[in-house]
From Swiss-Prot:
This is Uncharacterized protein YhcC. It is a single-pass membrane protein. The chain crosses the membrane at residues 2-22. It is found in: Membrane. Keywords: Membrane, Transmembrane, Transmembrane helix. The keyword Manganese does not apply. Its main location: membrane. Residues 30-58, 67-81, 89-113 have a biased composition (Basic and acidic residues). Coiled coil: none annotated. Signal peptide: none annotated. It comes from Bacillus subtilis (strain 168). It comes from the Bacteria.
Amino acid sequence: MAIIIAIIAAVIVIAALITFNVRNASPGPEKQEATDRIAPPEEEKNEAHYPAEARAAEHTPSVVKNDSPKEKRDTMGDDIYRQALQKFKHSDEVHAEEEVTEESDKMQDRSYRDALLSMKNKKK
């Protein structure tokens, strides 16, 4: 019995919340009048006195050369990074060009087999 009453109460609360939310979301005649009375922003009024080109010119970034020690340090760090990156790229190309000879393959296989045999012997 208590469960049924709790369910009915929950349904009533949910219905009330939905109704309250819908009433606040839809503009009534009072809210429409208030929005009509609001004056347009100052920017729209001054559009004729202050054209868009002038506003755009204010926001364009200008290139300023600054020889501060911090900027010099940053550019030096960038140069070092670029040099290191080129070294890594060059070393990758060198390793890619190296061909694996048949003798080196045999040596690697032999050392691998020796390692496996020594592991098997340790287990015994």
